[in-house]
Structure formats: structure tokens, C-alpha cells
């Protein structure tokens, strides 16, 4: 799933209530929930609550999350995956 923001208490949020309903359905029925969120989403508020970090199994992001998120992820049992920036080079 994707979201608009993750608050410092671990609340996952979005702006579009229709997208929230879809994300909540996915969370409720999936065997494993993967969240994709770049680092701009941390400490970013949004209007509608999607869920909480403890409902997520894996988080994919572009850099190490700021404090307090590493501790929150560990406490929630979320596996963190940081994408590497591999620039293509031409021979």
C-alpha cells in the first residue's frame, strides 16, 4: 500500500477517504502487508487514518527513517528495506 503520511506515534494517514477504504480492505485481508513510503512521508500529517505501523509487515523506503521511527518499526516488528540509489553508467 501507499500512504501520504506517517505520524510520530505510528499512525498511517492519507488524504483521500476512498483510497483509505481500499488500503484498509487490503490490510484486513492480506497475508502480508507491504508499505511503500519515501522519507518525505515521515512526520507528515494527513486527514484520514489508514491504520498503524503494527499492521505492516515490511516497509520500503529510500533512506533511513528519522527518529523516532526506527524504534517504532522495531517495536512493531516491521522489516525495513531501504532502496539503494544505483545510477546507471555507460561504458
What is the predicted role of each segment?
Residues 1-91:
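Conserved phosphate- and dinucleotide-binding cores of soluble alpha/beta proteins
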Amino acid at each position: 500500500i501507499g500512504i501520504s503520511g506517517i505520524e510520530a506515534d505510528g499512525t498511517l494517514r492519507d488524504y483521500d477517504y476512498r483510497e483509505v477504504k481500499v488500503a484498509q480492505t487490503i490490510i484486513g485481508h492480506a497475508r502480508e502487508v507491504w508499505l511503500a513510503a519515501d522519507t518525505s512521508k515521515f512526520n507528515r500529517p494527513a486527514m484520514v487514518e489508514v491504520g498503524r505501523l503494527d499492521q505492516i509487515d515490511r516497509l520500503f523506503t529510500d533512506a533511513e527513517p528519522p527518529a523516532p521511527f526506527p524504534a517504532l518499526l522495531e517495536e512493531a516488528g516491521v522489516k525495513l528495506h531501504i532502496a539503494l540509489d544505483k545510477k546507471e553508467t555507460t561504458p
